[in-house]
């Protein structure tokens, strides 16, 4: 799904969607799909009916993720198609409050995913904050003459492991989606995501936004 938007808020959403799409494809190719987007998801009618359709869904939003999870548990074959003809275009939320509400709704979909499957995303969200605490907490002056360079290089490598992969992921995703890529824009979106994603994840545990007239 390609997200088209204007300004800083639109760019953040566009880059975020490209990264999430690539994560969805990666987990699908690994045989453990974590995310799904109903805007361009297709399934066989027979498989859908065999699993009872959407019966049993307890939340107003998330039917796409819940269905994919049921398909996976039933041993159905699930695939991803990274092809321009499969791209669906959507508009970014034009307001900050709208974007926050949308992300609260998306995060709420994780209720349908097993706790074991959520461990890696949770580590991913908390990794930079733990790394920041470690970086700030080190008594750097005391390390002068005592393996200062080694500690600095190890931390630099740890930060590089966090910083480098996602912009490259966004670049590849935007190429598939036919969208222009900017390193600065991707970096800004990555920084913003690092700040708001943990807050959204925690808030989604207690906040249930209204969507299509119902609380999700």
Located regions from the model:
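Short loop/turn motifs at secondary-structure junctions and domain boundaries
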Residues: 32-34, 199-200
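Short secondary-structure boundary/capping segments
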Residues: 32-33, 78-79, 208
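Conserved nucleotide-sugar donor-binding
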Residues: 35-51
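Membrane-embedded multi-pass helical conduit in multi-pass membrane proteins
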Residues: 121-208
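Catalytic donor/gating beta->alpha subdomain of glycosyltransferases that bind UDP-sugars
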Residues: 1-22, 49, 54-117, 214
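Membrane-interface alpha-helices
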Residues: 206-216
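Short, P/G- and charge-enriched loop/turn segments at secondary-structure junctions
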Residues: 25-32
């Amino acid at each position: 799904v390609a997200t088209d938007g204007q300004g800083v808020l639109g760019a953040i959403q566009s880059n975020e969607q490209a990264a999430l799409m690539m994560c969805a494809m990666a987990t699908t190719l690994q045989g453990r799909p974590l995310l799904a987007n109903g805007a361009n998801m297709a399934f066989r009618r027979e498989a859908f009916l065999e699993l009872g359709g959407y019966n049993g869904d307890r939340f107003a939003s998330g039917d796409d993720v819940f269905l994919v999870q049921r398909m996976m548990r039933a041993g159905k074959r699930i695939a991803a198609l990274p092809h321009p003809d499969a791209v669906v275009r959507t508009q970014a939320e034009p307001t900050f409050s709208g974007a926050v509400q949308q992300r609260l709704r998306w995060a709420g979909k994780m209720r349908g995913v097993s706790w074991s499957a959520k461990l890696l995303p949770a580590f991913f969200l908390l990794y930079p904050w733990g790394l920041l605490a470690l970086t700030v907490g080190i008594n750097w002056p005391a390390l002068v003459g005592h393996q200062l360079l080694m500690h600095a290089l190890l931390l630099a490598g740890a930060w590089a492991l966090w910083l480098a992969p996602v912009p490259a992921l966004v670049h590849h995703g935007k190429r598939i989606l036919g969208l222009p890529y900017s390193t600065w824009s991707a970096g800004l979106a990555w920084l913003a995501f690092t700040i708001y994603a943990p807050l959204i994840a925690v808030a989604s545990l207690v906040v249930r936004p209204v969507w299509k007239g119902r609380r999700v």
